[in-house]
């Protein structure tokens, strides 16, 4: 019988530690295994938010035996996001502000209504503003007796999570899953043919979700190809800037595709809640008073679309940096057998790039891509950031 922790890929030590904590929490014994605040870190695709959600399910599990059965009502509702005592915070904008955090703290102060614990799971805790982080810190320092905080962030670097907040949490570091582990999941859980699973796993950068998308979504494969075409376009400066514009446009199209259906559904639901189409007494005044609510929805949807577009663009930049990294590794005599290439299916392109660009140029190219990612984090307009990166790539190639 599959338990919730079966969703983790290549994280055996994490599963053991979280299971021990859930057992201690259930038994109610004083133990160093359980605490009120946890910080899950790991690179994109490592499954840090999945691990946190699985732990939340294990804490709420009502079945006998090892917590996290995956079958009881508490486990299934937690994993589905419908458990009344598990609050999952997924930032839709570029940051988590003070107002939202105060609302979360109010929820955290309540006693659980149906479950064993009141669990607050904050994904992308690195998006907390400084003020919002301080609001959270106050309750983390003195947590309610039956409340558990689960924070997720890329790393323990002070730029990702405040030092003080980090010091109040038990740290759970996740590792990048191996290509073999990802391929096995795609074969056994998704029923993919071995060749398809192994290819998707090898080019996913250790990201399980991305491997699944690349294997099943033609548009995802097209976006990857389009992003990597920028590297060859750099040899022709006029084409390079056009390729950079295509990169931004592709990210915007992906965001629109992801958001459009949800945005329309939210608008319809809000219109219904506000009495759209009503003819009864008070309908006209209700419609007049809805302008502010509609404007707030539009603001949140715009912020969510911006974040989705930035995330899509960042994934493309990681692919571009990976191709330069592969060429640099090859230039220094490394082969795919000693170091895992990011793009093993592009061996000819990697070889050509290594032959055409000196090591210094490859290194400067990687730095240009990383500088672009940092600029996007600082809210520089994507087209400006990409144009500056392309200029840096052209200069690096000519060096």
Label each PLM-derived region with a short phrase.
Residues 1-134, 138-142, 157-159:
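Clamp-loader machinery-focused feature within the broader ASCE/P-loop NTPase space
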Residues 107, 323, 368:
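Solvent-exposed, charged/polar functional surfaces in cytosolic regulatory/catalytic domains
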Residues 320:
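Conserved phosphate-interacting/catalytic interface
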Residues 1-57, 74-77, 147, 153-316, ...:
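Charged, glycine-rich active-site and insertion segments that engage polyanionic ligands
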Residues 121, 150-151:
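Walker B beta-strand of ABC/ABC-like P-loop ATPase nucleotide-binding domains
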């Amino acid at each position: 019988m599959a338990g919730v922790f079966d969703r983790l890929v290549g994280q055996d030590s994490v599963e053991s530690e979280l299971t021990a904590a859930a057992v201690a929490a259930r038994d109610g014994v004083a133990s160093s295994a359980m605490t009120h605040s946890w910080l899950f870190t790991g690179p994109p695709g490592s499954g840090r938010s999945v691990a946190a959600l699985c732990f939340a399910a294990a804490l709420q599990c009502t079945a006998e035996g090892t917590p996290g059965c995956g079958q009881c009502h508490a486990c299934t509702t937690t994993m589905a996001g419908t458990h009344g005592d598990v609050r999952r915070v997924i930032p839709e904008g570029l940051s988590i502000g003070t107002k939202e955090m105060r609302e979360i703290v109010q929820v955290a102060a309540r006693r659980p209504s149906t479950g064993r614990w009141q669990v607050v799971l904050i994904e992308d805790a690195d998006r907390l503003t400084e003020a919002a982080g301080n609001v959270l810190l106050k309750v983390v320092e003195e947590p309610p007796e039956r409340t558990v905080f689960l924070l997720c962030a890329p790393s323990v670097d002070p730029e990702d999570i405040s030092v003080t907040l980090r010091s109040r949490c038990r740290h759970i570091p996740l590792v990048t899953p191996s290509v073999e582990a990802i391929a096995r999941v795609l074969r056994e859980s998704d029923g993919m043919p071995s060749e398809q699973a192994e290819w998707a796993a090898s080019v996913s950068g250790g990201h399980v979700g991305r491997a699944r998308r690349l294997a099943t979504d033609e548009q995802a494969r097209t976006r990857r190809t389009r992003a990597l075409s920028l590297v060859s376009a750099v040899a022709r400066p006029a084409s390079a800037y056009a390729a950079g514009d295509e990169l931004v446009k592709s990210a915007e199209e992906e965001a629109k595709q992801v958001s459009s259906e949800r945005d329309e559904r939210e608008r319809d639901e809000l219109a219904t809640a506000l009495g759209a189409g009503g003819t009864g007494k008070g309908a006209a005044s209700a419609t007049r008073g809805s302008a502010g609510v509609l404007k707030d929805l539009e603001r949140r949807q715009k912020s969510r679309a911006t974040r989705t577009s930035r995330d899509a663009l960042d994934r493309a930049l990681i692919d571009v940096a990976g191709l330069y990294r592969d060429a640099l590794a090859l230039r220094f005599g490394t082969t795919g057998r000693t170091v895992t290439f990011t793009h093993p299916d592009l061996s000819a392109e990697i070889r050509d790039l290594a032959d055409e660009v000196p090591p210094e140029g490859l290194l400067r190219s990687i730095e240009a891509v990383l500088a672009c990612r940092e600029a996007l984090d600082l809210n520089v307009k994507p087209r400006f950031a990409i144009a500056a990166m392309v200029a840096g790539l052209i200069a690096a190639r000519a060096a």
